[in-house]
Amino acid sequence: MKCRLIATGERAPSWVAQGFAEYQKRLSHWMPLELVEIEPGMRGKGRDAQRATDDEGRRVLAALPKNAYVVALDVPGRPLSSEQLAQRMEHWRGQGRDLAFLIGGPEGHAAEVLKSASESWSIGPLTLPHMLVRLIVAEQLYRAAAMLANHPYHRA
């Protein structure tokens, strides 16, 4: 099973990129994790934010792997504990499909993206910088994989 994290936004600051790369490396023997960065749509004074979100959505959909199980990160999505995420990951593995996790832009996901998602996941009600969400998702995927492999990383 391969995993693709498709994130809309600017290039991450070096400390986020380094942290992501660390978890990407740790995950590599359990589940290869690829980051695909989607350039954000044009926003600003006099620009239509919905148009920008729809443009991002088209590019996100184009970046989806064929037949992947798609999980959109979305505030109203289903909250999961680390243990529940590990259970979901075990279920996804059993399906034999690749995974795609989607992080939206400033206004979230386009409607078409949410419709294409197999499920949505909320990492909580906090408002977080989207760059930081990349790192949180990578860490939680590593934690879930470690739990499934009986690795001592998770000590809750």
Curated annotation (Swiss-Prot):
GO cellular component, one term: cytoplasm
Subcellular location(s) per record: Cytoplasm
Keyword annotations: Cytoplasm, Methyltransferase, rRNA processing, S-adenosyl-L-methionine, Transferase
Main location: cytoplasm
Class of enzymatic activity (EC top level): transferase
Catalytic activity, as annotated: pseudouridine(1915) in 23S rRNA + S-adenosyl-L-methionine = N(3)-methylpseudouridine(1915) in 23S rRNA + S-adenosyl-L-homocysteine + H(+)
Binding residue positions for S-adenosyl-L-methionine: L73, G104, I123, G124, P125, L126, T127, L128
GO molecular-function term, one example from the UniProt record: rRNA (pseudouridine-N3-)-methyltransferase activity
SUPFAM superfamilies (UniProt xref): alpha/beta knot
One Pfam family it belongs to: SPOUT_MTase
Entry's EC annotation: 2.1.1.177
InterPro entries, per database record: Alpha/beta_knot_MTases, RlmH-like, tRNA_m1G_MTases_N
Known function: Specifically methylates the pseudouridine at position 1915 (m3Psi1915) in 23S rRNA.
PANTHER family (UniProt xref): METHYLTRANSFERASE, RIBOSOMAL RNA LARGE SUBUNIT METHYLTRANSFERASE H
Assembly and interaction partners: Homodimer.
Family, per entry: Belongs to the RNA methyltransferase RlmH family.
Protein name (database record): Ribosomal RNA large subunit methyltransferase H
Gene symbol of the encoding locus: rlmH
